[in-house]
Amino acid sequence: MNDKMITIGKVTTHQGNKGEVRVLPLTDYPERFELLEQVFLVRDNRVIEKRVEQIRFHKKFVIIKFEGIDDIGAALAYKDYFIKIPREETLDLPEGHYFIFELLGFEVYTDEGIFLGKVVDIITTGGTDIIKVKGDKKDYMVPAAREIVVNINPDEEKIIIKPIPGLLDL
């Protein structure tokens, strides 16, 4: 079940004294929380389905009131739980954009056909994201800039890059 879910947030603590939880969004689209009716709270192989009563935003956090959680103690019991949703409930992205989880495991090649490795992580920086590629003998940090990433082929699970001079020497 867990592999068919994506993580969109993490409960960091309670909010107030009426059972609300404070959630750090782990998505580029925090507004997606407004569409939630139910979520799965997951930690240490424990999965709990919860209905959402109310959502509001406070600074960089999402404040969520779940059905049946009505006091601080009950809210604190969910600290450090991840909020997950089924993959089929993800938002539609513009063409040419991908969720991080979709790119993990893709093979990365240069435009000359040299295999570099597989995508193991994508680091969001607030600017240009960095694609972390694990090779057989070496790891690479590739900026996800249009000038460098020339093709992403989801059908073949392949990314083609045109490395700038020195990029692969680091």
From Swiss-Prot:
It is found in: Cytoplasm. HAMAP family: Ribosome_mat_RimM (MF_00014). One of its GO terms (molecular function) is ribosome binding. This is Ribosome maturation factor RimM. Belongs to the RimM family. The PRC barrel domain binds ribosomal protein uS19. Transmembrane segments: none annotated. Its main location: cytoplasm. Residues 94-167 form the PRC barrel domain. The keyword Membrane does not apply. Binds ribosomal protein uS19. SUPFAM superfamilies: PRC-barrel domain, Translation proteins. Keywords: Chaperone, Cytoplasm, Ribosome biogenesis, rRNA processing. GO terms for cellular component: cytoplasm; ribosome. The gene is rimM. One of its GO terms (biological process) is rRNA processing. InterPro entries: PRC_barrel-like_sf, PRC_RimM, RimM, RimM_N, RimM_N_sf, Transl_B-barrel_sf. An accessory protein needed during the final step in the assembly of 30S ribosomal subunit, possibly for assembly of the head region. Essential for efficient processing of 16S rRNA. May be needed both before and after RbfA during the maturation of 16S rRNA. It has affinity for free ribosomal 30S subunits but not for 70S ribosomes. Pfam families: PRC_RimM (PF24986), RimM (PF01782).
